[in-house]
């Protein structure tokens, strides 16, 4: 199976779901990486964000959000400093109920850097 960049997800044999956003340039307004409606089953979902730090500087603000049915499931916003520049976010793992709408977004205060998102969902 080939996984092409898309804001949606793909299903594979066995009912599991996969998604890859491709790479997006970060801007000061939220960039949508993935936006989809979960299939009609429960899924243990894992999301990994990859940040290209090459043009992000100390003092800039980076944020990302995982939204499920209009509610913020996870939000992280921080000022880039010498201690965290280059760090990749931890993997997020949660269970998504059937037919829920999921949206993953990110922003960066100075319009620098880029980000991508990979998703794997295991049908429970």
Task: Cite the ranges covered by each PLM segment.
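Beta-strand-centric surfaces of beta-sandwich/beta-rich domains
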Residues: 1-124
């Amino acid at each position: 199976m080939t996984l092409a960049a898309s804001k949606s997800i793909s299903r594979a044999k066995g009912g599991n779901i996969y998604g890859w956003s491709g790479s997006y340039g970060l801007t000061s307004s939220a960039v949508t990486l993935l936006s989809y409606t979960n299939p009609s089953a429960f899924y243990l979902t894992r999301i990994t964000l990859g940040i290209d730090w090459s043009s992000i500087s100390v003092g800039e603000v980076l944020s990302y959000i995982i939204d499920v049915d209009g509610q913020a499931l996870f939000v992280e916003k921080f000022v880039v400093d010498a201690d965290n520049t280059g760090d990749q976010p931890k993997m997020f793992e949660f269970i998504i109920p059937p037919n829920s709408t999921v949206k993953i977004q990110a922003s960066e205060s100075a319009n620098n850097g880029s980000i991508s998102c990979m998703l794997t969902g295991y049908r429970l």
